[in-house]
């Protein structure tokens, strides 16, 4: 089972560093607020000596278009969970669901089981964000059912972060109606033109490069 959240187990310095990394992300102000609110609520329950998992979900669903930072946010959540004493390892095991296309059911079950074992003590990022899955009707639902069956055998033993394409939030059990009771949902908004330019500038700076005025003008038109 997940360790019981006790009072004063929070590593506030590490929480601060994780939140600093969160703040460095471009845009996504709503997501930043949701995560900070989660941390504050978790801190409140910790001070009260209340087991966090008895009051709020520890599972997450990240939905949005590709390349919006879902993997980065998953790693930040893992760091926060380790600092809060929720998991032993602040690591994320990335499981690409598209790799299961074409597998027999017993092979798929074995693959999911191995992924859960590898993620034990950390977090499993169950990545369903792939255009290949759109072509396989009902595939996501079948794979999700296999995952749920294995998790049901060891309730409370695993923490899952689901990464889903935009407008496909289905929740931990595939039931959108009850989804908010079972997972914390983070919706990634598309970047604005200004935010895309900031991201481009940062990447160029990492390569010790700069845009010329002509290049900047071209990119402004291209992004627009």
What name fits each language-model region?
Residues 54-90, 117:
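Walker A/P-loop
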Residues 89-119, 141:
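Short glycine-rich substrate-engagement loop in P-loop NTPases that contacts/grips substrate
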Residues 130-161, 176-180:
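Conserved catalytic/switch belt of AAA+ P-loop NTPases
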């Amino acid at each position: 089972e997940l360790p019981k959240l006790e009072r004063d187990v929070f590593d506030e310095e590490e929480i601060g560093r994780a939140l600093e990394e969160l703040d460095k992300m471009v845009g996504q102000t709503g997501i930043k607020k949701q995560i900070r609110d989660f941390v504050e609520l978790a801190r409140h329950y910790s001070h009260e000596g209340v087991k966090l998992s008895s009051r709020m979900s520890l599972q997450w669903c990240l939905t949005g278009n590709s390349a919006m930072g879902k993997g980065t946010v998953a790693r930040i959540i893992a760091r926060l969970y380790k600092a809060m004493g929720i998991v032993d390892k602040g690591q994320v095991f990335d499981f690409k669901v598209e790799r299961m296309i074409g597998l027999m059911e017993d092979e798929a079950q074995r693959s999911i089981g191995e992924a859960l074992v590898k993620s034990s003590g950390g977090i499993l990022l169950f990545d369903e964000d792939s255009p290949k899955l759109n072509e396989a009707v009902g595939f996501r639902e079948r794979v999700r059912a296999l995952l749920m069956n294995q998790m049901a055998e060891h309730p409370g033993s695993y923490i899952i972060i689901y990464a889903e394409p935009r407008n496909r939030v289905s929740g931990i059990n595939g039931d959108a109606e009850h989804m908010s009771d079972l997972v914390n949902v983070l919706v990634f908004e598309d970047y604005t033109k200004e935010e895309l330019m900031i991201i481009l500038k940062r990447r160029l700076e990492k390569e010790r490069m700069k845009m010329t005025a002509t290049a900047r003008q071209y990119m402004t038109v291209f992004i627009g």
